[in-house]
Amino acid sequence: MDSNTVSSFQVDCFLWHVRKRFADQELGDAPFLDRLRRDQKSLRGRGSTLGLDIETATRAGKQIMERILEEESDEALKMTIASVPASRYLTDMTLEEMSRDWFMLMPKQKVAGSLCIRIDQAIMDKNIILKANFSVIFDRLETLILLRAFTEEGAIVGEISPLPSLPGHTDEDVKNAIGVLIGGLEWNDNTVRVSETLQRFAWRSSNEDGRPPLPPKQKRKMARTIESEV
């Protein structure tokens, strides 16, 4: 196993522990707590994949960070902060909408790269909106936290979420996954639109009907994909 992979996991475990202590003092806002919960799942998945104990890794990560901080000067810290572009966290969904449990009458699931797509194919003839919470950097979607499909009544009928054991995805991965989700929902004569925020940063465009610019050929392909492969 690559030593950098192990040490990266150890540092991530320790930094999560620090953030958890911060949250335990009721100092974190909603986006902070949301990322904390998501990162916990990711660490568990990575730990299982690597065969590493999280508690042991956290202690090792603490030692690594202590060595780094001993050598860190205030001037170096200022330069590092200035050179790192800042990302923004955008929310279409409330914390309740993100954490709410939901159930599918006709569950369908597809894994696309590091993203998991889930659809309730019992849903027909509904108006559906896709909402997402995600981070943005350089005015482009950076990391998807969670995307969910809602009916006008507020019921959850679809979802795209990162797989904890396979961290890392691009904005193109997200757009392709959204295409699969839309195709699956439209296969049952549902009308799907995407939130304006998601359109703006995933496609850098906004349509009046809330429809991302997927060509008809891709739409038919996505519908067949969700029908045959899920």
UniProtKB/Swiss-Prot annotation:
GO terms for cellular component: host cell cytoplasm; host cell nucleus. Keywords: Eukaryotic host gene expression shutoff by virus, Host cytoplasm, Host gene expression shutoff by virus, Host mRNA suppression by virus, Host nucleus, Host-virus interaction, Inhibition of host innate immune response by virus, Inhibition of host interferon signaling pathway by virus, Inhibition of host PKR by virus, Inhibition of host pre-mRNA processing by virus, Inhibition of host RIG-I by virus, Inhibition of host RLR pathway by virus, Interferon antiviral system evasion, RNA-binding, Ubl conjugation, Viral immunoevasion. A motif (Nuclear export signal) lies at residues 137-146. The keyword RNA-binding applies. Inhibits post-transcriptional processing of cellular pre-mRNA, by binding and inhibiting two cellular proteins that are required for the 3'-end processing of cellular pre-mRNAs: the 30 kDa cleavage and polyadenylation specificity factor/CPSF4 and the poly(A)-binding protein 2/PABPN1. In turn, unprocessed 3' end pre-mRNAs accumulate in the host nucleus and are no longer exported to the cytoplasm. Cellular protein synthesis is thereby shut off very early after virus infection. The lineage of its organism: Viruses, Riboviria, Orthornavirae, Negarnaviricota, Polyploviricotina. Residues 205-230 are annotated as: Disordered. The dsRNA-binding region is required for suppression of RNA silencing. InterPro entries: NS1, NS1A, NS1A_effect_dom-like_sf, uS15_NS1_RNA-bd_sf. Pfam families: Flu_NS1. This is Non-structural protein 1. It is found in: Host nucleus; Host cytoplasm. Residues 1-73 are annotated as: RNA-binding and homodimerization. Residues 180-215 are annotated as: CPSF4-binding. It comes from the Viruses. Residues 223-230 are annotated as: PABPN1-binding. Upon interferon induction, ISGylated via host HERC5; this results in the impairment of NS1 interaction with RNA targets due to its inability to form homodimers and to interact with host EIF2AK2/PKR.
